[in-house]
Amino acid sequence: MKHLSSLVVLLLVGGVWSAGADPKGDRKLVAKGSKVYAKNCVQCHGPGGDGKGFESMLQKLGARDFTQGVFKYRSTPPGELPTDEDLYRTIMEGVPRTPMPHHALLKKKEGRAVAQYVKTFFPAWKAEGEAQPVPLVPRPKNAGTPASLERGREVYRFLQCASCHGGTGRGDGPRAATLPPDTLGNAQYPTDLTLEKFKSGPEVEDLYRALMTGLDGTSMSAYGQIFTPPGDTGLQERDIWNLIFHVLRLKREGGFSAASP
C-alpha cells in the first residue's frame, strides 16, 4: 500500500510538470499540494480530479469534479471560479452533512498548497484568473428585531423560498420532489433550514454568501441582483439580512412558530 501511495504521488506530481497547468507559477507549492492531495483527497476526487475516486463510487453523493470548474461554495458571482480563500475554507472546514470532511489537522500551508493543486485540474483557471468576491453589505443595527424578522418572513414569501424549502423551512416544499439532478448527476434535495449546520458554513456571513452568489451547478439561484438597487422588486440591500435572520429563526425554532406560507 505504501508503494502504491508513492506511485500515486509520482503520477500526480508528474502530471503537474507535463501539463504545465500551474496557475501561479509556484511549482513547489503545487508539488507539495499534490502530495497532500494524494494522501487526503484522491480516494474520493480521483487522481484526475474528476470525482471518480474509488470511495466516491460507494457514496450516495458523488465527489466534486474539479475538471468542470463548477463550485457551490464561493464568495464570487454566479458562474465565476472561487477565490483561493474560498477553496482553502472548504478544504479546511469541510461541508457538513456530506462525505466531505474537515481537515483541521492539516497545516495552513498544506491546505493552501492543495488548494493550488486543485486549480490545476481546470486549465481555464490560469486564463481567467481570480474573480472578485461579492461585496458584503454591512449588517443593519436592527437586524433580528421583531420588525426585521417580520420583514424577513415577507421576503421569504415574496421570493417563493417555500416552494422548495417549505413554509416551515424543512425542505418539504411542493417543488422539492421534482428538482432535476445537479450538474454532477446527484439527486437534489432542498436544504432543511431547521437543521443544526448549514453546508455553506457556520457563520451568518456564510449564509449571506450562499444567498447572494447561489450554489453553482444546482437549482439554488443567486439573489444578489434582486437585493442590489436599482430594481423594481421593492427589495432593498438590507432585506438580505432580514431574510437571513428569518432563516435563522426557522432554524432556532424548528420552523413551527415562524411558518412562511
Located regions from the model:
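Electrostatic cytochrome c docking/interface patches
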Residues: 18-36, 125-157, 197, 235, ...
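Hydrophobic h-region of N-terminal signal peptides that target proteins for export
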Residues: 10-19
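Primarily the internal scaffold of c-type cytochrome electron-transfer domains
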Residues: 58-64, 68-70, 113, 133, ...
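Contiguous, function-dense segments enriched for cysteine-driven chemistry
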Residues: 74, 108-117, 121, 141-153, ...
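Periplasmic/extracellular electron-transfer cofactor-ligation site
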Residues: 28, 34-61, 97, 124-128, ...
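Axial heme c-ligation environment in periplasmic c-type cytochrome domains
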Residues: 57, 73-82, 86-115, 191-192, ...
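Sec-dependent signal peptide recognition
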Residues: 2-9
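Solvent-exposed, polar/charged alpha-helical surfaces in well-ordered, non-transmembrane soluble domains
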Residues: 31-35, 39-42, 64, 85, ...
